[in-house]
Amino acid sequence: MSEEISIEQVLRDSAARLAAVSDSARLDAELLLARAIDMPRSFLFAHPEDTLDDAAFKRLKQTLERRLAGEPMAYITGTKEFWSMELIVSPATLVPRPETELLVDIALRDIPRRADWPILDLGTGSGAIALAIARERQLCQLTAIDISADALAVARQNANQLTISNIDFLQGDWTAPVAGQQFKVIVSNPPYVSCHDKALETLRAEPVDALQAGEDGLESINKLARDCPAIIEDNGLLVLEHGAEQRNQVAEILMSYGWQHIQCYDDLSGLPRVSSAHFLHSETT
């Protein structure tokens, strides 16, 4: 760095560059700079005239280039907040989205505070959904499944750092590891993006298998609707996240496999993103 440059000037310059790839350019710049100087964000506001040394400037430049290349902030910082928990994330896991908190909220509405139910999270990734439910319903026993050993390693790390012990993590393909078991509630944020969706390009840094679900984006949801009746208790609850444009198709799939009391819920943007259904074994035998 040929000349001294203040924190405020670095923030302005960085935010201007990041505006091309981020809707939260100033925040991204603050987080990256705080990381580069190994100080909390509040330090930036209290010391805007302080200058950066060469080592900090080099660290900032490296992370800026990663962000400008489209890498999610969560992968650069290694963490993402979800349900007021700071979760570890890695390129082996999807970055937890704020809209997925709706899925947690819908599930919790149906689970009494003192319930001791068996609950299953399919495709757990970083463990965000399972950890949120396990923390809110500490008498329940959660089982969280993912096909990726690397994702499960991250999920276990999150459970350990949050000291949440009422979760078992299993590796396998969807319901296969729990064949013969029964659960009162099953939750899942499965892949639901069509392989032809142009949005995949903007999500290229994230694991494609956790996003893409066949030609129409409904392959995984169809599999869950078909297979979950075998492992759900009578009148058990299924809660799924899906694309905003998939509301009617998801309802049709659920009905075709005998699910009842199907409801859809809008996220904070007014988009239909989560559906729930119950399965009554007594009415399908």
Indicate where each model-derived feature is located.
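Conserved Class I SAM-dependent methyltransferase catalytic core
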Residues: 216-279
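Flexible, glycine-/basic-rich loop-and-beta segments that form/coincide
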Residues: 281-285
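Active-site beta-alpha loop architecture of Rossmann-like, nucleotide-cofactor-dependent enzymes
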Residues: 74, 193, 245
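Conserved SAM/SAH cofactor-binding pocket of Class I
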Residues: 98-200, 223
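Conserved hydrophobic residues forming the short capping helix/wall of the S-adenosyl-L-methionine
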Residues: 18, 111, 159, 228, ...
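Mobile active-site "lid"/loop adjacent to the S-adenosyl-L-methionine
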Residues: 191-220
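Conserved AdoMet
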Residues: 31-109
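Non-catalytic accessory regions of SAM-dependent methyltransferases
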Residues: 1-37, 42-45
